[in-house]
From Swiss-Prot:
Stretches assigned to the MGS-like domain: 1-144
Organism: Staphylococcus saprophyticus subsp. saprophyticus (strain ATCC 15305 / DSM 20229 / NCIMB 8711 / NCTC 7292 / S-41)
NCBIfam families attached to this UniProt entry: PRK00881.1 (NF002049), purH (TIGR00355)
Lineage of producing organism: Bacteria, Bacillati, Bacillota, Bacilli, Bacillales
GO biological process, one term: 'de novo' IMP biosynthetic process
PROSITE patterns found in the cross-reference section: MGS
One Pfam family named in its UniProt record: MGS
Record's signal peptide: none
Protein name: Bifunctional purine biosynthesis protein PurH
Record keyword Hydrolase present: yes
Domain statement: The IMP cyclohydrolase activity resides in the N-terminal region.
Amino acid sequence: MKKAILSVSNKAGIVTFGQSLIEQNYELYSTGGTMRELANGGLPVKSISELTEFEEIMDGRVKTLHPSVHGGILADRDKPEHLEQLQAQGIDLIDMVVVNLYPFKETVANPNVTEEDAIENIDIGGPTMLRAAAKNFKHVITVVHPADYNEVIDKLKNGTLDEAYRKSLMIKVFEHTNEYDAAIVDYFKDNKESLRYGENPQQSAYFVRTSDAKHTLAGAKQLHGKQLSYNNIKDADAALSLVKQFEQPAAVAVKHMNPCGVGVAETIDEAYKHAFDADNQSIFGGIVALNRTVEKSLAEVLHGIFLEVVIAPKFTQEALEVLGKKKNIRLLEIDMTIDNSEQELVSVSGGYLVQDKDNVKLNREDMTVVTEVEPTEAQWDAMLLGWKVVASVKSNAVILSNAKQTVGIGAGQMNRVGSAQIAIERAIEINDDVAMVSDGFFPMDDTVELAANSGIKAIIQPGGSIKDQESIDMANKHGIAMVTTGVRHFKH
């Protein structure tokens, strides 16, 4: 007669499943509450102690951790020496393990849970049996989800419980134990900081730190101000990522995950002035990131407007004294070393997406002039600055820039010409030294025509549309210099 161990915290359907196993010539062994549930359902069930000849101890903490259990589960039936060793020790084979774990997640979800309660709901024997059975899936059936009970019985009845299906059950086990262990780590690790709320007051939120490296937002040193909010953290990360792209002194202002002004110059004070002038309305209540030390002169300028967060590699003591007069402003010191991590992930319903970071760096030599007119040096400088910025703007993104600052930003529109219209409407200036920068190719020539009608004389875009030539012809018609990069910068 085959042997099955049943030990579940979720007892839904377990009596019916146990009865079906008996009908398939299984002998049932169980523990604690599961054994009582099966017995109360009228099923013949034996205590796990009859296998181990060892009584449960320490309030049930030790009951299945025994060679008579794990030897019977782990024995490779294809190895005669394993079977001989079992026989010598008087250990029987275990053919099925049905386990789901102590409800740790549900326990710690209670805001009044104590650490002692959490610890008592860390399952030890259950995961150990599951992992042992899953490792030996070729010979042992492992069931971790009640939703699989009916299918397992059906396959036992019709003889189709093959190795491929056993492997699918094995995968579910390791997914289950992985999630279980992750929940324990999340609860006990001191890397979780509760936030006042999420994007909106009706949403709870917390910040989980996976790194304390000084060049990351998680490793930043907060020098002043109240706790960062969920939105502060997201905007600060966007600002930090962009400002690190510049070697020369640079200032980046961000609002709702989009840059609203970017400036570069010989000094950080002048760079901030360019970023502020790029959009002196949207910067109000925003995040500012700077890649040089903030001294008193710049601090006095920053003090003059409402900002949520200021990020810099260093603040002088005099600058801190000036900015410290504003009670709520958050001041973050962060190492400006570029983050070389290669991947990023985003959660979606039921999982997450992982992708390589958009770290492609292009120089002028990597780009191609596709029009009759060549860009001027000033236009090249404008395009190179804009190309760094556009990768941080939500798609569809079209921006206008000169050599020292963004002059108009069109973000997040469902069509490219719409983004271009916004950038032009919001532009603080348009002249021969201003370039239009697009994160994606032009599907038709209407955006180029709009640029021409607005007085723009230089465009940089990825290229790659089947109608590229129409856009090039339109540029040539109006004497516009156009450059293609061969690289797209969509951002969602």
